Amino acid sequence: MNLAAMDPQTYDAQLEHKRIKLEQAFAQFETPSVEVFASEPANYRMRAEFRMWHDGDDLYYYMFDKVLNEKVRCDQYLPASVLINQMMSALIAELKPNPSLRHKLFQVDFLSTLSGEILVSLLYHRQLDDQWRTNAAALKAKLSSQFNVNIIGRARKQKIDLDKDFVVESLQVNDKTFLYKQIENSFTQPNAKVAVKMLEWAIDVTQDSQGDLLELYCGNGNFSIALAQNFNRVLATELAKPSVEAAQYNIEANGIKNLQIIRMSAEDFSDAMAKKRSFRRLEGIDLDSYVCNTIFVDPPRAGIDPDTLALVQGYERILYISCNPDTLKDNLEQLYKTHRVTQFALFDQFPYTDHMETGVLLERTQ
């Protein structure tokens, strides 16, 4: 974290620097001009994590500034949503005078939504007892007069949910509203308004699609649910059990009838498609019945492994969302042999940092 860089007055200049850097890095692939999707310059992050500092009777949030090499007190946090900033003030006022709730509290995590829900996770270096549960329930009741809030307590090998461990986000994407269950301690897009722009872009560049869609690394179904309208059927894979459960919830909540989620890794699915191995999880699923002309991938920062990349390269169209331009560039070295980039986008999920979220659409040339 570099707090000095978080200046809304310099946001446009910082984003332009990213655009230039991205275009230069990918010039060898003869990409079209980068389409840039900006963030709000403040209050854009829907989740935030803070360490807690105990100083006598005082208690406050802090982060570590890697540039200054020191901890920085954070009574408010410019990148965090307005809802998180409001909760930060209300929560600390309740924690300070409560020994049971503040004792050995070392971290607080917030997960908020555009729909107005917020989840607060309190992390401790001690086991939580009945007294903690009673006090936490009273805290939730007090905060509920101002917020739609749920509270979770965490300690080593211990988790206490007072009610539920998730929020339900509501995203307005073009003329449709999509509901997404987001589970505590699972991956979600941190910048909800930019996430909407990503969904709208993906829908736009695939609107003339034929046949079915295959998605790898689908998470909670964020993209596959929104893209289902453009395809006959969608087959999606995800390994993490909580994400798969959230995806099934989201499929039902959004009334999606043409999407099937398989819980398995991209690597295993690649083996299944290549007929190298058979998997019990694929029993009853006729992979050969899918006519997937388009594949969608949103891999982790490490990019796509070689076997999966070979699978991806076999499709006519490849929609690739990347959170790491370096590994995207590495993967394009191979994909560029058979495909050309027809759409190129920069989504500023992480203002005031060097991180760049990118999207490319590749179409087969041979």
From Swiss-Prot:
UniProt GO MF annotations: rRNA binding; tRNA (uracil(54)-C5)-methyltransferase activity, S-adenosyl methionine-dependent; tRNA binding
Keyword Cell inner membrane: no
An example Gene Ontology CC term for this record: cytosol
PROSITE patterns registered for this protein in UniProt: SAM_MT_RNA_M5U, TRMA_1, TRMA_2
Catalytic activity: uridine(54) in tRNA + S-adenosyl-L-methionine = 5-methyluridine(54) in tRNA + S-adenosyl-L-homocysteine + H(+); uridine(341) in tmRNA + S-adenosyl-L-methionine = 5-methyluridine(341) in tmRNA + S-adenosyl-L-homocysteine + H(+)
Residues at the catalytic site: C323, E357
CDD domains found in the cross-reference section: AdoMet_MTases (cd02440)
UniProt keyword list: Methyltransferase, S-adenosyl-L-methionine, Transferase, tRNA processing
Gene Ontology terms: biological process: tRNA methylation
Residues bound to S-adenosyl-L-methionine: Q189, Y217, N222, E238, D298
Pfam families: tRNA_U5-meth_tr
SUPFAM superfamilies: S-adenosyl-L-methionine-dependent methyltransferases
E.C. number(s) listed in UniProt: 2.1.1.-, 2.1.1.35
Keyword Membrane: no
Function (record text): Dual-specificity methyltransferase that catalyzes the formation of 5-methyluridine at position 54 (m5U54) in all tRNAs, and that of position 341 (m5U341) in tmRNA (transfer-mRNA).
Recorded family membership: Belongs to the class I-like SAM-binding methyltransferase superfamily. RNA M5U methyltransferase family. TrmA subfamily.
Cited PANTHER family: TRNA/TMRNA (URACIL-C(5))-METHYLTRANSFERASE, TRNA_TMRNA (URACIL-C(5))-METHYLTRANSFERASE
Name of protein: tRNA/tmRNA (uracil-C(5))-methyltransferase
Organism this protein belongs to: Shewanella putrefaciens (strain CN-32 / ATCC BAA-453)
Gene expressing this chain: trmA
